[in-house]
C-alpha cells in the first residue's frame, strides 16, 4: 500500500525540524561577564560611577553600585556578606569594618568636609556661625547620626561646639543622607542644613544652594577610603579599581566633584 500524503508530510516536517534544531545544540553560550558589587555613600556616587565605567571597559566586567547612607550600607555588608568594595563618607565606618573583619585592604582616594548650606543667595541672611542652627527663626534640617556619614559628622561637630542637644530640639526633621538634605533646600523644606561640601558642586544642586563654611576648629577634612571586602569574588579587579581610584587620574575625578581639594 502506498503511504498516504499526510504521513509523508509529517515525516518531512520532523526531518526539517531536526536539521533546524540540531546545529543549535552545538552553539556555545556567551560567557557571562564577571560582576562586581560596590557599596558607595551617596556623596561619592558620581566619581565612583565614572571610575566604574573605565574599569568595566578595561576588564570586560560589569560593576553594580548600590548607594545609600554609609551606616546603612555597613549594616547591609555585615548582614549579607557579599560584595567587593565599600566607600563610605567617613573613615570611621572603614575603621568599624576593619574591626569587624569585613575588610582586608584600603586606599585613600579623596576628602570630604561638612558645611552649612542655605538657599541660593542666602535670602534670609543666615550667619555662618554654628549658633544659627539653634535659631528658631530658621527651618533647620540635619542628617540622622544613625544612618549616614553626614549625620555622624554633624553630631561630632555639634558635640564639639556643645550644642548638639539644642540643635536637635530646634530641627524640623532628620534625614537619612546627603541627597535628602539637598532635596530639602531645593524644595523649600529647609532654610538651613548641614551637608557635605561636595554636594554643592553637583550640577543639579549648584544653582540652588549657597555654602556657609564651618570653621576648621569644628569641621576638619575627612579622608575618603575605599575598602576591599574580604568576601570579594573578583579581588584582582577590585584591587585594580582601588589602584586606579588612588592614582593621579582617579583623584582628578574625585576633585572634579569637590571631593579632593577641599578647603
Cite the ranges covered by each PLM segment.
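Hydrophobic anchor at the start of a short beta-strand
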Residues: 63
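Exported/periplasmic ABC-transporter solute-binding proteins
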Residues: 25-58, 66, 71, 75-81, ...
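Bacterial N-terminal signal peptides
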Residues: 11-21
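Bacterial N-terminal signal peptides that target proteins for export
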Residues: 2-13
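Short active-site segment of divalent metal-dependent hydrolases/proteases
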Residues: 87
Amino acid at each position: 500500500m502506498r503511504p498516504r500524503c499526510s504521513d509523508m508530510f509529517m515525516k518531512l516536517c520532523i526531518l526539517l525540524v531536526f536539521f533546524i534544531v540540531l546545529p543549535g545544540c552545538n552553539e556555545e553560550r556567551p560567557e557571562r561577564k564577571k560582576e562586581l558589587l560596590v557599596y558607595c555613600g551617596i556623596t561619592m556616587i558620581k566619581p565612583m560611577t565614572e571610575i566604574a565605567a573605565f574599569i568595566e571597559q578595561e576588564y570586560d566586567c560589569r560593576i553594580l553600585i548600590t548607594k545609600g547612607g554609609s551606616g546603612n550600607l555597613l549594616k547591609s555588608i555585615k548582614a549579607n556578606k557579599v560584595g567587593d568594595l565599600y566607600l563610605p563618607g567617613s573613615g570611621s565606618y572603614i575603621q568599624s569594618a576593619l574591626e569587624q573583619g569585613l575588610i582586608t585592604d584600603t586606599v585613600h582616594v579623596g576628602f570630604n568636609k561638612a558645611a552649612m548650606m542655605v538657599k541660593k543667595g542666602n535670602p534670609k541672611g543666615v550667619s555662618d556661625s554654628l549658633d544659627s542652627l539653634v535659631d528658631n527663626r530658621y527651618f533647620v534640617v540635619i542628617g540622622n547620626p544613625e544612618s549616614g556619614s553626614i549625620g555622624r559628622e554633624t553630631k561630632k561637630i555639634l558635640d564639639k561646639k556643645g550644642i548638639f542637644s539644642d540643635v536637635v530640639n530646634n530641627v524640623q526633621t532628620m534625614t537619612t543622607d546627603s541627597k535628602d538634605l539637598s532635596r530639602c533646600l531645593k524644595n523649600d523644606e529647609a532654610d538651613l542644613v548641614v551637608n557635605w561640601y561636595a554636594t554643592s558642586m553637583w550640577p543639579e544642586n549648584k544653582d540652588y544652594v549657597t555654602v556657609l563654611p564651618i570653621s576648621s576648629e569644628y569641621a576638619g577634612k575627612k579622608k575618603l577610603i575605599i575598602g576591599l571586602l574580604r568576601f570579594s569574588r573578583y579581588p584582582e579587579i577590585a584591587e585594580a579599581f582601588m589602584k586606579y581610584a588612588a592614582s593621579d587620574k582617579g583623584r582628578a575625578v574625585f576633585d572634579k566633584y569637590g571631593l579632593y581639594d577641599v578647603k
